[in-house]
Every structure is written in C-alpha cells, then in structure tokens.
Amino acid sequence: MEKLTIAQIKKMLTEEISSEQLAELKLDERKGVQLAIKSYEKRLKKIENEKLEFQNRLKIERDLWDKGIEYIAGVDEVGRGPLAGPVVTAAVILPHDFDVFEVNDSKQLSEKKREELYKKILEKAVAVSVGLSDNNLIDEVNIYEATRLAMKQAIESLNITPQKIIVDAMTIDTKIPQLRLIKGDAKSASVAAASIVAKVTRDHLMQFYARIYPGYGFEKNDGYGTKQHLEGLENKGVTPIHRQSFEPVKKILLK
C-alpha cells in the first residue's frame, strides 16, 4: 500500500476494509494512524455487539416462525405520560430476512437514528400500521383503556391479519393469540420496530401541533410537563389538545 496521509487513512477507515489492508496499516507507526485504527476497531466491535444483541431480540420471532407462525405483529405505544397530545401505537410485522440490526427500543436511540430506522422499517416490513387515541378519548375512558383501544386499532388496520401478537406489557382486546412481554421493546425485534414507528409518528404530530399552538414547546417536550410547557399553561391557558383529566391541566381549568 502506497504511503497515505493520516487524513486519507482516517477516511479509508470510515468504511470496512479487508484484514490484509488492516494488517498493513498496523505496520504504520505514526501515532495518528494507530489512534485511527484503535477507533476503527472499537467501532467494529460495537457493530458486532449490536448484531449479536439484535439476533437475541429476534429469538422469539424465530421460534414462532419455526413453528409455522408466519405473521407475527409486534405492538407498542408511546405517549401515555404527556399532558397534551394523543397516545400513539404501532403494529409491525417483520419478514424472516429482516436484518436492520440497529432496530432497538426507541428510547435507546437518538432522534436522527429513529428517523433513519423508521424509513427502513416502512421499506422492509411486511406490514405496518398505527393507532391513535386523542386527548378527548383519554379523558373519557382513562389513559390505560385509551392505549388498549389504540393498540386494537393498529392491529385491525394491518393489511395482513397476524397469527400472533407480541405486545409490550399490556393485553389487547382481540381473539388473535398474544404474548404479553414486559419490556418487550428491548426483547423483541418486532416490538422494537413498533416502538420506533409509534415514537416517530407521535413526534411528527407534536411538531405539527407546535406550529398550531406555539409557546408550549411541543416540538421539544412532546407534550410532557417541562418548565416551558408548564409556563405556557400558566400564561396561555389550556389548548384543545391538552388532557383535561391530567394534573396540573385539571387544576388550571378550575381556576
């Protein structure tokens, strides 16, 4: 290999290289090169670990596929805790060859990574759907029941009827056999994919609401009770998307 500059080597190491190329680079004693190699190997190790963890998250699906259960829907929700906006759910059926190893619990991912994976899930999944319960329904039936209704809506909106449902920590009112899995978004790839779809969908909705109702910081807090949000409630009052059964919204309405 012709003598390269450190900058050229760093650029080269942004992509995967052959073991022969790596061995040759290791002969270069320049400190900058050795640091670049160390960083490269650390990144490869991280990817290797992520792939292994992903295979573990696919174990439940793989076991069911081996039993002839073809269509398995992972179901998850986001938005049970905020003071404003809907609770959003998603249902995702993954193909047997799904290999997007970075798909994980949405809470473990950056906004940029979630957006990137959201597009890949929509592109590669067998079926994807979302369900939604708005703040009025939440106030009418309570957040738990509203979440269950949104999950049922997501399942019924799939263009393929699943043979099995894996749901994160809840049960859905359906005759389809279901597996209730505590922390399912960290244990099942299908549920993890659903958590990403639900989160990105709700984030987009809250960004839309932020333009309609400025001054509450919905684009940053997603409707949660941050300082800016609480100050907005005090100064501007309650919006049509606030959950009136939630404190301190309820208290403000009584003033």
From Swiss-Prot:
- Paste the cofactor note: Manganese or magnesium. Binds 1 divalent metal ion per monomer in the absence of substrate. May bind a second metal ion after substrate binding.
Give the subcellular location: Cytoplasm
Entry function: Endonuclease that specifically degrades the RNA of RNA-DNA hybrids.
Tell me which GO cellular component terms the UniProt record holds: cytoplasm; ribonuclease H2 complex
**Residues that bind a divalent metal cation, according to the entry?**
76-77, 168
Q: What is the lineage of its organism?
A: Bacteria, Bacillati, Bacillota, Bacilli, Lactobacillales
Cofactor(s) named in the record: Mn(2+); Mg(2+)
Give the species this sequence originates from. Answer: Ligilactobacillus salivarius (strain UCC118)
- Show where the RNase H type-2 domain sits: 70-255
Tell me yes or no: is Hydrolase among this UniProt entry's keywords: yes
Q: Tell me its EC number(s), please.
A: 3.1.26.4
Listed under GO biological process in this entry are:
DNA replication, removal of RNA primer; mismatch repair
Q: What name has this protein been given in UniProt?
A: Ribonuclease HII
Alphabetized Pfam families for the sequence: RNase_HII (PF01351)
- Where is the secretion signal located? none
* Record keywords, A-Z: Cytoplasm, Endonuclease, Hydrolase, Manganese, Metal-binding, Nuclease
Q: Which family does it belong to?
A: Belongs to the RNase HII family.
Q: Which InterPro entries match?
A: RNase_HII, RNase_HII/HIII, RNase_HII/HIII_dom, RNaseH-like_sf, RNaseH_sf
Q: Which reaction does it catalyse?
A: Endonucleolytic cleavage to 5'-phosphomonoester
Q: Which GO terms describe its molecular function?
A: manganese ion binding; RNA binding; RNA-DNA hybrid ribonuclease activity
Principal place where this protein is found? cytoplasm
